[in-house]
Amino acid sequence: MGLSNKFKSFFFLDEEEEYYEEEVAREPEPMQKKTKKEKPSKNRFYAVEEEDAKVVSMQGAQYSSRMVLAEPRVYAEAQELADYLKDYKTVVVNLQRISHDQATRIVDFLSGTVYALGGDIQRVGNNIFLCTPDNVEVNGSISEMLDEQNFM
């Protein structure tokens, strides 16, 4: 028994030395209310997102009032046009004074940009394109009207 008491005292605390840790009662944290927000997509379907209820400033809605008219001469100017789109500015691109290969590359680059930003690109004339960010909605089509009036 003496040996077992030595093991107990070595590995375990003696009854006199036992330490009890009292748990401090925490105050419950207030829960944030989750709200479901309907977000319209391009196909007029509604995607439901769950997000925290927060107050957001409406400064983003003011960016849609800017429009940039551009007539690039080289492919390197496509990045500047993409930066305008990232800043929520509508861009009208006239590609009539650039080679066909360069124009194709610019349209491909801008198509990828507007896709990534959730925007849209439309042909509005012969080598003229309208690129819009996601906060701009375009109704109608000029190309169809031009075809009807034989302008092309």
From Swiss-Prot:
Domain of life: Bacteria
Record's keyword terms, sorted: Cell cycle, Cell division, Cytoplasm, Septation
Region ranges (Disordered): 23-42
Function of the molecule: Cell division protein that is part of the divisome complex and is recruited early to the Z-ring. Probably stimulates Z-ring formation, perhaps through the cross-linking of FtsZ protofilaments. Its function overlaps with FtsA.
UniProt family annotation: Belongs to the SepF family.
Assembly information from the UniProt record: Homodimer. Interacts with FtsZ.
Protein name as it appears in the record: Cell division protein SepF
Protein's organism: Listeria welshimeri serovar 6b (strain ATCC 35897 / DSM 20650 / CCUG 15529 / CIP 8149 / NCTC 11857 / SLCC 5334 / V8)
